[in-house]
Every structure is written in C-alpha cells, then in structure tokens.
UniProtKB/Swiss-Prot annotation:
Pfam families linked: LIM, LIM_FHL2-3_N
UniProt name for this protein: Four and a half LIM domains protein 1
Residues in LIM zinc-binding domain copies: 40-92, 101-153, 162-212, 221-276
UniProt keyword annotations, A-Z: Acetylation, Cytoplasm, Developmental protein, Differentiation, Isopeptide bond, LIM domain, Metal-binding, Nucleus, Repeat, Ubl conjugation, Zinc, Zinc-finger
C-alpha cells in the first residue's frame, strides 16, 4: 500500500496537482501562499509560488514590485544601489549624492550648468537677482547678506552716487568731506589732473592741484613774490592789511630780523621791528 501524498497543512491529496516543497514538507499552492510565502516589501502581499521573486538582504519583492524608490523604474533585471534602506537605480543614486541647488533644492547632476559661491551651489538659471528676479547666471553680482543683486539693481538700491556726475560708484571711488566721488571725476578744475592720492587745495568748492593752485589761485608773498601754497616750508602764513607773507619772509626791512609772531611796525607798506621803526 502506497504512502499518502497529501498537503502538510490542509491534508488535501497532491497526486496530479502542482505543489511546493518547503523545509522538507509538501504543500498545495493555496497553503503555500497562506503559510509559507514571503511577503513583498512593496505591496505587502504574499509572493505566490508561481510568481517571480527578487530577494536582497533578507527582504523580498515581486519582480514587478522591485523598483527604484525615486523614479519607480523596474530593477529586477538591472543593477541597483541600496542607500539608507532604499533601493535606487544608478541614475537616482547619483542624484542622491549630488549637491542640492540652493534655489530649487533639486540635485545638480553632471552636465548641469551651475554657479558656486562660498560653498553654496545653484543651477545657473536658479541664480537670480533678489530684486528683479532676472537670471544672474555667471554674470557680475553683488552679495548683500543672504541676497544677491544684479549690477543694475545694486546701483539703484545701494550704490553711492558721485557728487559730480551723479552716476553710481560700483567700485573704488573716493570720499572727501563725506562726499563720494569717482576717482576719475575728482580732478583739478583747471588742468583736469586726477587728485586722488595727490596733494590739492579746495577753494570755494573748487579743487586745484598744487601747480594750478600756485599759478592761478594762490596769493603772492609780499616779501619774495612767490605763491603762498600752504604746503611744505611755506605752510605758515602772516597776513596783515590785505597782504600776505611766508612766515620766513616776514622780517624787518632794515635789519632783516624775522618778525613772525613778534611785535612789528607797518610803515609805508614796509615791515619794521620796533627798534628800526624808531629811527625812521
């Protein structure tokens, strides 16, 4: 008498039927699905005996459920990457490791045009002016806190304007008496020589280089007849009765003693010390 060939679980005869052998036991397909089948990680349904199964690190999927967690591309017959418990296709795995755009927060992948500034990166078209929203891309810009401005908007909102030409000072520039100038606008009123970094004299809101001040503006010393510039040796001046002298030229007409910061007598347009004045 032959031994019975029955399902281990329901005891239904298996003779002439499809069955599965699991752990040395025979079971019908119905009982296999109910008691023995692995559960698909994705759909949470049992993986039946006649279904194709994918397993990886003690986890199981129907072959058509084994997809990239990002783009859902089927991966049953392709290479894949496991990252933080997620199954990813190679393309999405690359994106996962790629830097994120500060503007749109999407991955910047190989081939994308991008802009990097102080360790932060943007897609080229995401790097825009905080004011006008136009794309700055790889053009010139001005950072202001967390914002970025194109040249035009920065000039309008923040740049100082030259007191002479009233145009924005975008770089360099100088300040004189709290007023901003372009270096090329701050020039001698007579010869147009640039005065930035040079000695100059201001007379009634007009600016002169040393040579032009000497030749066209400076008073002449009543003693030596040379210009009194206020520079160098002649920086100290004596003025009296509408006339001016270098301090070193202000001396007695007769004895030549220097009278700067001393008592003197002015007689017939001439300067005398008190002793010589008594002898006149």
């Amino acid at each position: 008498m032959s031994e019975k060939f029955d399902c281990h679980y329901c005891r239904d005869p298996l003779q002439g039927k499809k069955y599965v052998q699991k752990d040395g036991r025979h079971c019908c397909l119905k009982c296999f699905d109910k008691f023995c089948a692995n559960t698909c990680v994705d759909c949470r349904k049992p993986i039946s005996a006649d279904a194709k199964e994918v397993h990886y690190k003690n986890r199981y999927w129907h072959d058509n459920c084994f997809r990239c967690a990002k783009c859902l591309h089927p991966l049953a017959s392709e290479t894949f990457v496991s990252k933080d418990g997620k199954i990813l296709c190679n393309k999405c795995a690359t994106r996962e490791d790629s830097p994120r755009c500060k503007g749109c927060f999407k991955a910047i992948v190989a081939g994308d045009q991008n802009v990097e500034y102080k360790g932060t990166v943007w897609h080229k078209d995401c790097f825009t002016c905080s004011n006008c929203k136009q794309v700055i891309g790889t053009g010139s810009f001005f950072p202001k806190g967390e914002d970025f401005y194109c040249v035009t908007c920065h000039e309008t909102k923040f740049a100082k304007h030259c007191v002479k030409c009233n145009k924005a000072i975008t770089s360099g520039g100088i300040t004189y008496q709290d007023q901003p100038w372009h270096a090329e606008c701050f020039v001698c009123v007579t010869c147009s020589k640039k005065l930035a970094g040079q000695r100059f004299t201001a007379v009634e809101d007009q600016y002169y280089c040393v040579d032009c001040y000497k030749n066209f503006v400076a008073k002449k010393c009543a003693g030596c007849k040379n210009p009194i510039t206020g520079f160098g040796k002649g920086s100290s001046v004596v003025a009296y009765e509408g006339q001016s002298w270098h301090d070193y030229c202000f001396h007695c007409k007769k004895c030549s003693v220097n009278l700067a910061n001393k008592r003197f007598v002015f007689h017939n347009e001439q300067v005398y010390c008190p002793d010589c004045a008594k002898k006149l």
